[in-house]
Amino acid sequence: MNNYFIILASGLSKRFKSNKPKQFSIYKNKQLFEHSLDKAINSKLFKKIILVVKNKKELKKKYTDKVHIINGGKERSDSSLKAINYIKKFNPTNVLIHDGARPNFSNTLLINLIKNLKNSIAVIPTIQSVDSIKYKINNQTYNLDRNNCYLTQTPQAFNFKKLYVLAIKEKNKVKDEATLFINKD
């Protein structure tokens, strides 16, 4: 088991319109990110879990030694890159990257993501869009066929070495690690 789990929880949640970031909102007596953290710990699938926060000194709760807390960056891509660089020293085989404000994933999903990494360099959970989607280019609006549209979710799973090479090469150009792997066979 050389799997690592990164939880990105340092964002400001600008779209959430609250006085505190979404990942720190209370849901079922815990902060949102803690649900993800507990699921990762309880799965026993990960050698280490990296919690990326804005300021680690603000976290009052102590976690198991398996949990490493690091400070994030200005943008999601900065935080992700910091976490990827941080775990490089442990020589991980696989890494799963998760959004700290999204607590609703199952242990079965974690198992399937890791299992599917045996035959892929990236495994991204998606759901097919049920909504109509419009796309605008230069004041022209187009309809996209929702049968061809998928919404990406987290956690997203990657072969660490492949992710590291692409993340370093692209640095802060992406909003989501899955983007690094699109059409890269």
Features from the language model and the residues they span:
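Short amphipathic alpha-helical segments
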Residues: 18-21, 38, 45, 62-64, ...
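Hydrophobic residues at beta-strand termini and immediately following loops
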Residues: 27, 70, 152
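Conserved N-terminal catalytic core of the sugar/cofactor nucleotidyltransferase
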Residues: 32-92, 170-173
